[in-house]
């Protein structure tokens, strides 16, 4: 069979196009300028958005970058390792034709990586079971499953009043100088799945894992996280990504995406329940602003790019559950509010995308309360689907509502006391003040290494609510009140047994032992 010239041309054209698609490997020496973290290249053929490029410096050093923008035959590349030392005339750029992918494997658990996904724990390279695009695969909205069932953190203020459902995304709003890093480390140590019975709570199940990504942290904070995870054994089920403050700012843009790609592999291919903690998202937003300024884009609020809402959603929306997969991704991003301003663009836009917030309060911190979580501005929008009979306990919802109501009333009573004095307060106001003090000192206050199950937290909540007579607990249904109020009283009476009675009981037991001898 003889092919015509036209047919041969078509076959050759198709082969060339396929060759470019598979592995073009085009090299250029056409760098025309460097602007901040960006490199501008001229006369580029077939550039692609998000394509990975390798830049070879005159000294032989190779750095990775990503095509950020294409204007005709001009390509703008952001360099992950920074642009210092790049010579415009002597730097060679290679276009790979591929997007940024990360090698993933179950062996990533127990390992520590830098912000670009390279191991920094003196261990071997990860033996890849798959290579995944760090931007993730789009999830069909119809295939998403509503987040249900609870993830326990071991922190009473979260588990009892702001319960987190598997597949939920709920940020922690903090500020400079507050112990959000300690809270994050405590959650990593204690987090697990909740069993529906009081006497069985296995927080370290084989199908529960944690992916932790830190962006822009200093050396002291990075050392704290590594030591804490290693000493408490939580590193075995954790994959840790660390982008330090002295690392290139641009690297912070890919660090959370590397972490989430790892989480997606563990959740959807190995069917684990994955808790992903990202800190600090403010550093990520500042990196976005730096790139936007280098590209000379029109700035939005406070200099941040106008597309920051869309960009943040590409991170937060990767949490969830998918039909046909038993795993889930639960996200807890942590951000520091500049000047404690909750209306700042970063917390403001984050609040629009996520499903609630956990608020770390400076006033509680100044009182010496740890963790200083203020439950009044905190909210978990998916809490109702994570609690109740069969998941935690049937009294959970009513107890949470009653604690919120009494704590708010206690705050009002404290404000009134500051104006009129304690003598002018009613008996109910004095009860509210007593509840306020005990709530903050015994319920919210918790040791950094104190792990409370959700059932222990609920029992402690009932012991606080017993300050009030039954008729004043109007947020709890009569049936729940009859079942749990007296039970809480009986438990408290047993704990407050007379010490003289206990000592006489011990003497009686000792005399019985002597008579037996």
Curated annotation (Swiss-Prot):
Pfam families in alphabetical order: ATP-synt_ab, ATP-synt_ab_N, ATP-synt_VA_C
Record: residues binding ATP: 381
UniProt keyword terms in alphabetical order: ATP-binding, Hydrogen ion transport, Ion transport, Isopeptide bond, Membrane, Nucleotide-binding, Phosphoprotein, Transport, Ubl conjugation, Vacuole
Origin superkingdom: Eukaryota
Region described as Disordered: spans on this chain: 487-517
Start-end of Basic and acidic residues biased regions: 500-511
Record location of the Glycyl lysine isopeptide (Lys-Gly) (interchain with G-Cter in ubiquitin) cross-link: 14, 508
BP-aspect Gene Ontology terms: ATP metabolic process; endosomal lumen acidification; Golgi lumen acidification; intracellular calcium ion homeostasis; pexophagy; proteasome storage granule assembly; proton transmembrane transport; transmembrane transport
Principal subcellular localisation of the protein: membrane
Residue numbers of Phosphoserine PTMs: 4, 137, 503-504, 511, 515
Keyword Transport included in the entry's annotation: yes
InterPro entries assigned: ATP-synt_VA_C (IPR055190), ATPase_a/bsu_AS (IPR020003), ATPase_F1/V1/A1_a/bsu_N (IPR004100), ATPase_F1/V1/A1_a/bsu_nucl-bd (IPR000194), ATPase_V1-cplx_bsu (IPR005723), P-loop_NTPase (IPR027417), V-ATPase_su_B/beta (IPR022879)
Membrane topology: Peripheral membrane protein
GO terms, molecular function: ATP binding; proton-transporting ATPase activity, rotational mechanism
Protein localization: Vacuole membrane
One GO CC term, this protein: membrane raft
Similarity annotation: Belongs to the ATPase alpha/beta chains family.
Note: Present with 131000 molecules/cell in log phase SD medium.
Subunit structure: V-ATPase is a heteromultimeric enzyme composed of a peripheral catalytic V1 complex (components A to H) attached to an integral membrane V0 proton pore complex (components: a, c, c', c'', d, e, f and VOA1). Interacts with RAV1 and RAV2 components of the RAVE complex, which are essential for the stability and assembly of V-ATPase.
Stated role: Non-catalytic subunit of the V1 complex of vacuolar(H+)-ATPase (V-ATPase), a multisubunit enzyme composed of a peripheral complex (V1) that hydrolyzes ATP and a membrane integral complex (V0) that translocates protons. V-ATPase is responsible for acidifying and maintaining the pH of intracellular compartments.
Protein known as: V-type proton ATPase subunit B
Organism name: Saccharomyces cerevisiae (strain ATCC 204508 / S288c)
Source organism phylogeny: Eukaryota, Fungi, Dikarya, Ascomycota, Saccharomycotina
